[in-house]
């Protein structure tokens, strides 16, 4: 049974033709990886390209005023190389005939770069893990997911990892 989905985007009614490009931002944490099966499943089902994105903090975040900036350059290069290698490993693990993937490594403020990549790459969906923080923890640390949701040019699917359950 075929259905047509209509959605309203900034006052305009459009016909939804499915996902073509899905963005999965990762910080390589187990929490972020909990969202990966959702992104992969949606990409396979829609025959969409899956973009794996990692955002490195800006180099300025690492520079200590008492140290020469040049001393940090080799460390930053190693960090960039390690992140690129990790993205490639993830991409290789997902390789298959029914999934097209693409990796992007960038640097800056995470939520800014996620939104920027979604716009630049014309992504139809962002699949993003969330901590689900509330109260004081949320007020102090903020939320990458919340900032992405507020600014994203496309829908955002947030995935909260399973909670720990005691056997008691």
What label would you give each PLM region?
Residues 70-85:
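A short acidic, glycine-rich active-site loop
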Residues 35, 62-65, 115-116, 138-140, ...:
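Short, well-ordered secondary-structure micro-motifs
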Residues 11-70, 99, 164:
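Small/aliphatic-rich secondary-structure junction motif
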Residues 1-17, 31, 92-126, 163-168:
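Structural beta-alpha unit
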């Amino acid at each position: 049974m075929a259905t047509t989905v209509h959605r309203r985007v900034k006052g305009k009614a459009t016909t939804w033709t499915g996902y073509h490009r899905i963005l999965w931002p990762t910080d390589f944490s187990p929490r972020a990886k909990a969202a990966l099966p959702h992104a992969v499943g949606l990409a396979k089902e829609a025959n969409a390209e899956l973009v794996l994105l990692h955002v490195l903090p800006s180099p300025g975040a690492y520079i200590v005023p008492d140290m020469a900036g040049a001393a940090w350059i080799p460390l930053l290069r190693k960090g960039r190389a390690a992140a690129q290698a990790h993205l490639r490993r993830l991409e290789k693990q997902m390789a298959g005939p029914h999934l097209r993937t693409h990796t992007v490594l960038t640097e800056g403020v995470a939520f800014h770069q996620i939104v920027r990549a979604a716009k630049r790459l014309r992504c139809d969906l962002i699949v993003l893990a969330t901590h689900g923080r509330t109260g004081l923890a949320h007020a102090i640390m903020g939320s990458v997911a919340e900032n992405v949701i507020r600014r994203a040019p496309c829908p955002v699917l947030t995935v909260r990892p399973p909670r720990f359950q005691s056997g008691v």
